[in-house]
């Protein structure tokens, strides 16, 4: 039964109402500093910890709760007579409920004007110590670190005569250990990122020790293949527009491959300003287009490769309306992603309950890092978010691209970044015409892309081509020109650039170098 609570919080959201409810239930309130003042100003009966322990706060508040009368009351096991006798001997009442959240270290170091001294002063000592004590003794002590749990605790207390069951205490304790681990991880990341220990501003993006925190969203039926087990975790720092923040409106449970492919589709479609549609199969775009609206964009994207689109993942950067829904519903689709779905669109898919509909806010945020596991290690890099500016483009051929060709080239370049290397993408009129992905030879990717267009009945005459990396020889260029391309965009940087540029002039096409490579493995 909860008779006495200690409350000390930095985030004071809802704390007055929570404390009032506890007081109304007959719970004695202990508190510190600013929290105690807030509760007292609200008219609540509260005892300062300094008065409770008989020992004043000291060292500018660095020592408040580090006292046997606090930690003894938290850590004592109620089922051990010797523990209870020790409390009685030293006149230490039990503390049955601990409500603590920590100094805002992460928010502090995010400020541009933060100094190392500021960061150090926002490393909480007493808070984590109390939290860990209470979480360790969770059989007897309820510990709350998240304001979202205030209502849960109150409801259970009211239903059980001020008592909290073991299941709730255990869940709250695990939440505490996760929270303190994340807190210490953030401190470690910060301190080991300093390249000059006297300068907050001098920080490496890659700390000497890297700690990351993820919460499990769900267990998955299996992994990439049925014999592999799997689960999906959400980055606690995920931006609003990230796939992990999806809301599933209907459909079967997402699979490992559904999630991986959905991320590829969503990241690609977000890069377009005009209404766009991206169709993904095995993490590669098999159709991308912009149009007047979602239905128009889908119709154009589907034309690229109707065969591969079967059972694909489809993403839109605009609301899916009834017209778009009716067009998509004619095909077999695994997952459909959009910022929103109209009521009429939802009604269309209500008859296809296996189709997974995901809503995600169309935010600008991206993951801070791109991660790849290797044997015994982790590769960490900044996200490939580079968008070339017109001023960075260099026309290296005698012929300049026309305005239409320039639009097609920039569209193709945007798509190529999301195609597995080696990537060759034919485009025209705001849509992909042929995609060659994942080949060991760039010339093979070029051949496959042209074959794909031929199989789809699409002409490549007058098309634009993007290559994610340079042409090592002229052979790849010869293939795309033979297929009908009249302009090419590529990074350049090959030791044979002059030979490739000369071949472009020989063919009478326009070529642009970006100076940016987009390998994707």
UniProtKB/Swiss-Prot annotation:
UniProt pathway annotation: Purine metabolism; IMP biosynthesis via de novo pathway; 5-formamido-1-(5-phospho-D-ribosyl)imidazole-4-carboxamide from 5-amino-1-(5-phospho-D-ribosyl)imidazole-4-carboxamide (10-formyl THF route): step 1/1; Purine metabolism; IMP biosynthesis via de novo pathway; IMP from 5-formamido-1-(5-phospho-D-ribosyl)imidazole-4-carboxamide: step 1/1
Coiled-coil regions listed in the entry: none
EC number: 2.1.2.3, 3.5.4.10
Gene Ontology cellular-component annotations: cytosol
Origin: domain of life: Bacteria
Molecular function (Gene Ontology), one example: IMP cyclohydrolase activity
Keyword annotations from UniProtKB, A to Z: Hydrolase, Multifunctional enzyme, Purine biosynthesis, Transferase
Pfam hit, one: AICARFT_IMPCHas
Disulfide feature: none
SMART domains: AICARFT_IMPCHas, MGS
GO biological process entries: 'de novo' IMP biosynthetic process
The record's note on its domains: The IMP cyclohydrolase activity resides in the N-terminal region.
Listed NCBIfam families: PRK00881.1 (NF002049), purH (TIGR00355)
Protein name, entry field: Bifunctional purine biosynthesis protein PurH
Lineage per the UniProt record: Bacteria, Pseudomonadati, Pseudomonadota, Betaproteobacteria, Burkholderiales
């Amino acid at each position: 039964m909860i008779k006495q609570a200690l409350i000390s919080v930095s985030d004071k959201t809802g704390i007055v109402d929570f404390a009032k409810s506890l007081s109304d239930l007959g719970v004695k309130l202990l508190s510190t500093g600013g929290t105690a003042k807030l509760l007292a100003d609200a008219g609540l009966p509260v005892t300062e910890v300094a008065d409770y322990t008989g020992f004043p706060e000291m060292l500018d508040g660095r020592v408040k709760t580090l006292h046997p009368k606090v930690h003894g009351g938290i850590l004592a096991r109620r089922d051990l007579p010797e523990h209870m006798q020790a409390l009685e001997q030293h006149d230490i009442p039990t503390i049955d409920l601990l409500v603590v959240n920590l100094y805002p270290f992460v928010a502090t170091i995010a400020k541009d004007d933060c100094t190392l001294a500021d960061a150090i002063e926002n490393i909480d000592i007493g808070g984590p110590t109390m939290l860990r004590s209470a979480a360790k003794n969770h059989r007897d002590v309820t510990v709350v670190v998240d304001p979202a749990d205030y209502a849960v605790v109150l409801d259970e207390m009211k239903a059980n005569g001020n008592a909290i069951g073991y299941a709730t205490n255990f869940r709250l304790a695990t939440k505490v250990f996760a929270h303190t681990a994340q807190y210490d991880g953030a401190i470690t990341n910060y301190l080991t990122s300093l390249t000059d220990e006297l300068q907050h501003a001098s920080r490496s993006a890659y700390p000497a020790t890297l700690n990351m925190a993820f919460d499990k969203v769900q267990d998955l039926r299996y992994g990439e293949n049925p014999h592999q087990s799997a689960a999906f975790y959400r980055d606690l720092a995920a931006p609003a527009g990230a796939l992990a923040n999806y809301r599933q409106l209907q459909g079967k449970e997402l699979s490992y491959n559904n999630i991986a492919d959905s991320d590829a589709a969503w990241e690609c479609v977000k890069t377009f300003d005009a209404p766009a549609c991206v169709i993904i199969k095995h993490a590669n775009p098999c159709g991308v287009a912009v149009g007047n609206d979602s239905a128009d964009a889908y119709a154009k994207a589907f034309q690229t490769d109707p065969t591969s689109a079967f059972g694909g993942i489809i993403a839109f950067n605009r609301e899916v309306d009834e017209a778009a829904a009716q067009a998509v519903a004619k095909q077999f689709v695994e997952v459909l992603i959009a910022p929103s779905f109209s009521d009429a669109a939802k009604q269309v898919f209500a008859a296809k309950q296996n189709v997974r509909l995901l809503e995600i806010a169309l935010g600008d945020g991206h993951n801070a890092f791109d991660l790849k596991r290797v044997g015994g290690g982790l590769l960490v890099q900044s996200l490939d978010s580079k968008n070339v500016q017109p001023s960075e483009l260099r026309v290296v051929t005698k012929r300049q691209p026309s305005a239409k060709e320039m639009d097609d080239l920039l569209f193709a370049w945007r798509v190529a970044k999301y195609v597995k290397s080696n990537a060759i993408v034919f485009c025209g009129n705001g849509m992909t015409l042929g995609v060659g992905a994942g080949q060991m030879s760039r010339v093979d990717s070029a051949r496959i892309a042209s074959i794909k267009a031929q199989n789809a009945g699409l002409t490549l005459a007058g098309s634009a081509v993007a290559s994610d990396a340079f042409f090592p020889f002229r052979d790849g260029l010869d293939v795309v020109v033979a297929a009908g391309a009249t302009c090419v965009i590529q990074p350049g940087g090959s030791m044979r650039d002059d030979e490739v540029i000369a071949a472009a002039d020989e063919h009478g096409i326009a070529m642009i170098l970006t100076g940016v490579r987009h390998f994707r493995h």
